[in-house]
Design a protein with these regions (language model features):
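Accessory nucleic-acid engagement/destabilization modules that flank
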Residues: 2-254
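C-terminal helicase lobe and adjacent C-terminal extensions/tails of nucleic-acid helicase motors
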Residues: 131, 475, 532, 536-539, ...
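Conserved pre-motif I regulatory segment
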Residues: 256-293
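Walker A/P-loop
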Residues: 286-308, 441, 467
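Conserved Walker A/P-loop ATP-binding site and its immediately adjacent core
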Residues: 318-342, 355-361, 470-474, 555
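A substrate-engagement module of RecA-like helicase motors
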Residues: 337-402, 408-412
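Post-DEXD/H (motif II) to motif III coupling segment of the RecA-like Helicase ATP-binding lobe
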Residues: 426-432, 439-512
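Conserved interdomain linker/interface between the two RecA-like ATPase lobes of SF2 helicase motors
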Residues: 486-558
Length: 904
């Protein structure tokens, strides 16, 4: 910047509370931030984001970005801020007091935080409202119009002492004009008017630059007796940038649309579905939304990754976000996507990868990538071209890495009115967004997904949605959200039952094609049975060997069925798989099941094995069952479960050569209580009504789903059905209302959009922690997660007997980091009853009290701080909130009401 600063050299920008001999003049922090903004634009920002920011040429964007960095803390040039920050720096205070007294009523300072003050000062100097609002929002939340409007008049004593107005206005003018001239402007009138969408992205970039420039590891403070020197620039910024070493944007290479290149990348030639996807994205004139509806196991993941390469290469995207329904599915696909990401990264220009969910730091594969895994050995280290960059490890920075694999929550949070949401928009705007299992979200989550799609459509972010079982109505909602409701009403693509089906947009046009399958289909026979009939069916089906899967809707039902089968079929091996196992136990079971009934499993491993599980079997396991029993569930999920039946080609025992699925049901006039609690009556009733005797796959997948979900096109179905429908629809409306209370505004309907400002943009933001925010995008009661350890009769604390050899851990001191990581992995989500509104406070209160009395020192461990420890006795039982809990290796966690507790 031009060396014209005079009076403002004495203003303080940053101090060190622990070392009063250091400070940073305000001008230096502004120069640091401006320099980082420039480098982010030149070297880190993908081309697609530059276009979305609305400037016709990069130099204009660069000038505005540098201006924002150089002026963002002008609100610190106020008496309220300077009087406060200089309390502990008498020498620097003395310099400033030679120019002006620092008298400021302490009780009023909160009314003018420096971000708000900065916006007010810029508006005073006729800066465009949108630019000023970015400064007001740079701490993560835009200001309210009311708060900004009365700042200089209502709280003038926060801006300058009585009689000192001209002195402080001179400060503002000097800073503003210096920054303007450095950026090539002569006056604020030359700054562009932006719309709120462009301002969201620039705010995200400014927050990022400010965080980097505020890190003393990159930008050290200087001795308090120094004022800094212009001669240090740009070398000071260059050193920091080199030390930070952010990865460059991903530059996808063209050519993957060629079948030979595809085969090199993935190890097999593209099938009909994959070829259709690649043709669509290779010929589209503009980025858009693409929805692929295709059967389980057809290679949708590879199709999506190849399409992402094509679109990134054509439209200048700098990364990929891959979102999945659960942590288990994200963990399951992470090694696969890591392998793909390695092919996209060069050793000299490594890309950053991020596993983004609440328990990512417990994922062994992810830890090994960081060199932190507890099982890491020199000869076992794999060479990867991607890296886990330190700067992206924070939750709010997660989406800024090049390749992000995580739960769909990371995308949904971009639609939540939450502080610093602009960082999520910045990260997503530069990526191809892939959402797997897009049918798997309820009405509440879909509200957030739709709002996120509206913003992604505005930014022209390519979006790929994958599903095997998508209702046509939902397909239409997704496309219309991306196009901001601009689609043609009642267009044929909205009701198509073709399958596999590809729907995509090219500008305003919606295109669609049914893909002729290039592999033979299969017929699955369906029967129904009741619970008492189950053992006989499995005895008959497994008479000559083979394996069976039983998928039910609740953990309690799974445990009950497993016990029934163990007693009725003692010659068969019955394994349980559900969500209420400890993390290590569940991982061990998953690995065992993948080895025994996965794609490459041998007959001798499969024979006489019955796996009983819950929805996690349909979501996270690539298993191949010889026969399937599933509890009645909504048709789309039932078809997902059938996708685990005869999944791969293999030789099967004679009674199992015909694919057969038995549907476990209670009868015509009732539903299982647990199933009803999970899914409600209406969709269960509709599925039962349209359940066929056989299904031809894949052709009949879509027609069956549309039958169950297309009730609007039917005549009323009688009093019982109408009552269930009304209850269902009322429930969905309530879910929508709850979600809409916390959504960010739509891109084009923000009530101040015509004023081109972010003010009032996020007034429904609540003070939510990261876990609370993640919970806000999922409906229902909060879940309670615990770490499970054992307390023996002598009071010593141990791992469970089969975990870490049952070794002891000191209770009176923080565990060493490696031990703390092992403890943190003993995670278990308690059953839903423990999170109910009438129960959860008591649960947490009892656990916290027990932890304070026995394990207070563990809270000093960074990995264990804030965790709740459930201590089991020597019989692996515990009492909690009026419940008796028991854990064992075979069944997981079971619970029942305490017999002596009459009041709960």
């Amino acid at each position: 910047m031009r060396r014209t600063l005079n009076k403002t050299r004495f203003l303080a920008g940053k101090t060190d509370p622990e070392n009063t001999s250091l400070w940073l003049p305000l001008w230096m922090h502004l120069w640091d931030t401006a320099g980082i903004m420039e480098r982010l634009v030149r070297q880190w920002l993908p081309e697609s984001v530059k276009r979305a920011m609305g400037f016709d040429r990069e130099e204009a964007l660069l000038a505005h970005a540098r201006f924002l960095g150089g002026i963002h803390d002008i609100g610190k040039a106020t008496v309220a801020f300077q009087a406060n920050i200089l309390r502990t720096l008498p020498e620097a205070r003395q310099w400033l007091e030679t120019l002006t007294p620092l008298d400021c009523p302490e009780q009023n300072r909160r009314e003018s935080p420096h971000a708000r003050a900065g916006e007010a000062v810029l508006l005073w100097d006729d800066c465009p409202g949108g630019i000023a609002s970015i400064v007001g929002a740079h701490h993560g939340k835009p200001q309210s119009c009311a708060a900004v409007d009365d700042q200089l008049e209502g709280w003038e004593s926060n801006y300058y002492p009585k009689g000192q107005k001209e002195v402080w206005e001179d400060f503002w003018t000097e800073l503003l004009m210096t920054v303007l001239q450095d950026c090539g402007f002569d006056d604020t009138a030359e700054l562009d008017d932006l719309n709120p969408q462009e301002e969201v992205l620039l705010t995200g970039l400014l927050i990022m630059a400010d965080w980097i420039a505020s890190n003393t590891e990159y930008f050290p403070l200087i001795p308090v007796e120094e004022l800094g020197s212009m001669e240090d620039y740009p070398a000071r910024v260059d050193r920091a940038w080199e030390k930070l070493a952010l990865p460059f944007p991903w530059e996808a290479q063209p050519g993957i649309a060629d079948p030979q290149e595809f085969a090199v990348r993935f190890g097999f030639a593209p099938n009909a579905v994959q070829r259709a996807v690649l043709e669509a994205v290779d010929t589209a004139a503009e980025p858009g939304i693409l929805i692929l509806e295709a059967q389980m196991g057809v290679g949708k993941t590879e199709a999506a990754l190849a399409a992402a390469e094509v679109m990134a290469s054509r439209f200048g995207l700098g990364g990929v976000f891959f979102g999945l329904p659960t942590q288990a599915t994200a963990n399951g696909i992470f090694p696969r996507l890591l392998g793909w990401a390695d092919t996209q990264s060069e050793e000299t220009l490594p890309q950053a990868i991020k596993l983004a969910h609440g328990m990512a730091e417990l994922n062994e594969c992810y830890l090994r990538l960081q060199g932190r895994g507890v099982q890491l050995e020199e000869d076992a280290q794999e060479a990867h071209q991607v890296q886990v960059h330190q700067w992206f490890r924070g939750n709010k920075q997660a989406l800024l890495a090049n390749f992000v694999i995580g739960t769909v929550d990371q995308l949904l949070l971009a639609a939540l009115a939450q502080k610093h949401v602009m960082l999520r928009h910045l990260g997503l705007a530069g990526k191809v967004v892939i959402i797997d299992e897009c049918h798997a979200y309820d009405t509440y989550m879909n509200c957030y997904l739709d709002r996120a799609l509206e913003w992604l459509g505005w930014y022209k972010v390519p979006v790929i949605l994958l599903s095997a079982t998508l209702p046509a109505r939902r397909r239409a909602e997704l496309v219309e959200a991306y196009q901001q409701k601009k689609a043609v009403p009642d267009a044929p693509w909205k009701t198509s039952c073709g399958y596999p089906l590809l729907t995509w947009t090219d500008g305003a046009e919606v295109k669609q094609t049914a893909i002729p399958p290039d592999a033979p289909g299969k017929t699955v026979q369906l029967t129904t049975l009741t619970e008492p009939e189950l053992p006989a069916l499995l005895r008959r089906k497994l008479a000559e060997g083979g394996c069976a899967g039983v998928i039910v809707n609740t953990v309690k039902k799974a445990q009950k069925i497993a016990q029934l089968l163990r007693e009725s079929l003692p010659d068969k091996e019955v394994q349980l798989f559900h969500a209420q196992f400890l993390m290590p136990d569940r991982a061990a079971r998953e690995n065992q099941l993948m080895a025994r009934i996965g794609k490459g499993s041998a007959p001798e491993c499969r024979n006489d094995l019955i796996v009983v599980g819950t929805q996690v079997m349909e979501q996270s396991l690539d298993i191949d069952l010889d026969v399937l029993v599933t509890e009645l569930c909504p048709m789309d999920l039932l078809l997902q479960r059938i996708g685990r039946l005869h999944r791969h080609r293999r030789s099967r025992p004679a009674p199992l050569q015909q694919a057969c699925c038995a549907v476990l049901d209670t009868g015509e006039n009732a539903f299982d209580a647990g199933s009803e609690a999970v899914y409600g009556q209406w969709l269960l009733w509709r599925t039962r009504k349209f359940l066929p005797r056989s299904i031809r796959l894949p052709e009949e997948i879509s027609p069956l789903v549309q039958q169950v979900y297309g009730w609007e096109r039917e005549a009323p179905g009688g009093a019982q059905g109408e009552e269930m429908r009304c209850v269902y629809e009322q429930t969905q409306e309530k879910k929508k209302a709850r979600a809409e209370a916390y959504l960010v505004p739509q891109p084009e309907t923000h009530r101040l959009a015509q004023l081109n400002t972010l003010d009032d943009w996020m007034q429904n933001e609540g003070a939510r922690s990261d876990p609370a925010a993640r919970a806000a995008v999922r409906d229902g009661d909060p879940s309670v997660e615990v770490l499970v350890m054992q307390r023996r009769a002598d009071g010593s604390i141990h791992f469970l007997p089969w975990q870490e050899g049952g070794s002891a851990v000191a209770a009176d001191s923080p565990p060493p980091p490696e031990t703390a990581l092992k403890i943190a992995r003993q995670k278990l989500r308690l059953p839903a009853v423990f999170g109910k509104a009438w129960k959860v406070d008591r649960v947490i209160r009892e656990l916290e009290a027990d932890n304070r009395s026995r394990l207070a020192a563990w809270q000093l461990s960074p990995l264990l701080h804030g965790e709740l420890i459930l201590l089991l006795d020597e019989n692996l039982t515990a009492r909690l909130a009026g419940m008796e809990l028991c854990y064992d290796r075979e069944n997981g966690l079971t619970y029942q009401k305490e017999e002596t507790d009459e009041g709960d």
